[in-house]
Amino acid sequence: MDLLSNLPYELLCHILSFLTTKEAALTSVLSKRWRNLIAFVPNVDIVDHDIRELFMDFVDRVLALQGNSPINKFSLDCSGVDSDRVDCWIQNVMVRGVSELNLSIFVDSVFEDDYNLFPKVFENKKLVKLGLSYISWLDGSIFLPMLKTLVLESVLLSVEKFEILLHALPALEELVMNNIYWKERDVVDLIVSSESLKTLTINFIVCTHTLSFDTPILAYLSYSGYVVDDYAEAKMENLFEARISLLVVEGDISRVRALINNDLLEDDEYDVLQFENVWKLMNGIRNIRCLYLSPNTLEVLSLCCESMPVFKNLKSLSIKSAENRGWQAMPVLLRNCPHLETLVLEGLLHHVTDKCGDACDCVSREDKGRSLTSCPVKVLEIKGFQGTTKEMNMIKHFLEYFPCLKELKMYMEENDPAQLRVPEVITGEMMERYKKSSSCNVQLLVGGKLYKKWTP
């Protein structure tokens, strides 16, 4: 007999809990001892979008086999099933004390005849984590005193019900909102308010007019979405880390640049003036220690330079660049981070204008490098490095003007043509350029191999 079959039942069930329920059921053919193990597996994870009747019969058999045994996690990912039977499945696991419930019930049309969530889902004193996808409506009373994590994806909501829901979750620590649609077809003023929330992830909320945050102990924010008309309130005093990725269309970028250059047509002013309100969002996160900005976000911030807050606690700043997005806001960002220690640049190539600022060497200026000389950054990381002459010149510019720089780390972009060259040649060229910067340690990672230049 093999060693695996000799393991205790408890350990075998723990191993099976890492498989989907269908995969776990298939192990019953291994031996008689394995035949009924599925009845004792504490996690049920069911995914099926094919033969609907057979699928529903399978779920019925699994739950019947498990009887009243305790259950920790129930995940259901399916489409086109009988809503009454789904309600029975949910009721079954809730009676058995499920603490994590994930439901993704998809129908053929978007939010047409979607599965209406079993109302008792929101009356459970043991539920700790709840994930809902493709659910069209949340209704009924709410009693989830232990819920810590709520994940909403492709869900159709009422703003009023959503705000009531948040206030009814006293233990909520993590909220994830992906592709949220609102039942209100007119102007939507959304307030994310929670006294207990620590982690918030927002990806693409549709048709929102204003967005406010009242989250006094929030520690982590990941926000990706189109710029709303106004960020009316942003109470995030205890925020530690933020990732901001604003979405814009190409026409908006053209209008932003025209406004900066005083070339914007009067009819287009309204379309971009809302971008100036992004400063309110930035002001709300001013106490952070770690900040990540996308290329679009950096470009939009060019309209907020005069109102940019001082990030007095910021230690690590990560900025992703794109060749078609500008660095106009880079100088003010560096000047407004008086205690910055680590700067991470994901790419160096960017859209060059005469207002690109003094942070790079793209345009000859009298105040070249001024924003760098006042920046206390000690570690500079360059990711996606391609080994071009333009990049190497820019890095040399950083080495010359960052007065406190102690360490430079460069990561060659994977699968980049530059890697086809002899690494020693690339390294030799770079070290020759940077040999005068003797006060800084330089590291270059090429194809998994690390090259170093250490100071004495």
Swiss-Prot record:
PROSITE patterns: FBOX (PS50181). SUPFAM superfamilies: F-box domain, RNI-like. Residues 1-54 form the F-box domain. SMART domains: FBD (SM00579), FBOX (SM00256). It comes from the Eukaryota. Pfam families: F-box (PF00646), LRR_At5g56370 (PF24758). This is Putative F-box protein At5g38390. It comes from Arabidopsis thaliana (Mouse-ear cress).
